[in-house]
Amino acid sequence: MYPLARRILFALDAEKAHHFTLDALNTVYKLGLIPVTDNRTKPIKLMGMDLPNPVGLAAGLDKNGEYIDALGALGFGFLEIGTVTRNPQPGNPQPRLFRVPEHQGIINRMGFNNHGIDAMIRNIEKSKYQGVLGINIGKNAVTPIQNAADDYLICLEKAYAHASYITVNISSPNTKNLRALQGGGELGALLEALKNKQAQLAAAHGKYIPLAVKIAPDLDEAQIEDIARVVKSVEMDGIIATNTTIDKSSLGSHPLAGEQGGLSGFPVREKSNRVLKKLAEHIDGALPIIGVGGIMEGGDAAEKIRLGTTAVQVYSGLIYKGPALVKECLKALAR
C-alpha cells in the first residue's frame, strides 16, 4: 500500500507532500481507520520513564504538535515533537526540503519553522495521547547566540508541565551559529542554566521532567569527548545522537549535493553510528543515549542498540518505507 502512495507523494513538492501526508493520516485516524495495535512489545526504562517499546518518532515530523494522536496510533514507544521556539517564526525561504531517492536521503534547511511554544501547548492540551511525549526546543533565528539561553529557558519553563521529557536542540545546521553551542564552555554554561531551571521547576510542579540534549554527527573525537564530559558533569538525563549532517560527500555528483542544509536518511547512517560508538565509550553508562540517524530498516535500529543506545528514533526512514518501518524495527529488536 505505502509503496504506491509513496510514488504519488514523491511526484509532489517535498514540503507539500509532507503536509498532505500528515493531514491524510489525521483524517484516517479521526475516522477510526487506523487499527489499534499493542505497542507494548519490548518495555524499557528511559530517563526514569516507562516506555512500551524503544522505537520513537524523532523531532521534525510534527513541529507544532498538531498530529500527536494520529502519530501515537502508529505503534511508537514515544513521540518527540518540535523543534519549537519561544516565538513563532516562518523558517527559511522555500524551497527548503529536498528528497534524494537515489541515496534514500533527505536534505532540509527548514530553519525551525513553527508556530511558537504557546501554540504547541494549546495543541498538546487538545490531544488525547497518553504516551511518552518529548518536546524539542530551540532558539529563534533573530535571537543573538549570546542570548540563546534566554530562549531555551523560556521554552523549558512553558513546556515543563506538558512534556514527559524535553530535548535541547543545539545541533541543527539551519540556524546560524547554533552548533557553536556544542563547544565545551558554551555547552556547559547553557546546560548548567537549564539544569538549574529544571530543579526550580521540579520543586514548583512536584514532578521531575528529564532533560536531554541533541548533538550533531559532524564532530571529531575530541569534541565528542568534550561533550560527554560536560553532559556527565552537569548530570543531564539523556543525550540524543545524532541530528543531520552538513557533509554531502556521500551524494557524489548528484545535482542536489550542493544544496545548503542538513542531510538525513541512509547517507548519515555511518557518520551517526561513528559518533554514537565513540559517545557510548566516553559516556560509559552515565546516562542513556537515544540513537537516531539513518534507520531505514529494522537491522539499522538493532545496530544502534548494539552500539550502546537505550532507545532509537526514526524519521527519514518513515518517508521512504512508511509506518511499516516501526513494526520492522520492533521485530528486529525482539530477536
From Swiss-Prot:
Gene Ontology cellular component list: cytoplasm; plasma membrane
EC class of the enzyme, as a word: oxidoreductase
Source organism superkingdom: Bacteria
UniProt-listed Enzyme Commission number(s): 1.3.5.2
Reactions catalysed: (S)-dihydroorotate + a quinone = orotate + a quinol
Stored InterPro entries: Aldolase_TIM, DHO_dehydrogenase, Dihydroorotate_DH_1_2, Dihydroorotate_DH_2, Dihydroorotate_DH_cat, Dihydroorotate_DH_CS
Record's bilayer topology term: Peripheral membrane protein
Pathway participation: Pyrimidine metabolism; UMP biosynthesis via de novo pathway; orotate from (S)-dihydroorotate (quinone route): step 1/1
One Pfam family cited in the UniProt record for this chain: DHO_dh
Main location group: membrane
UniProt cross-references to NCBIfam families, sorted A to Z: PRK05286.1-1, PRK05286.1-2, PRK05286.1-4, PRK05286.2-5, pyrD_sub2
Quaternary structure note: Monomer.
Name of the protein described by the UniProt record: Dihydroorotate dehydrogenase (quinone)
Organism: Neisseria gonorrhoeae (strain ATCC 700825 / FA 1090)
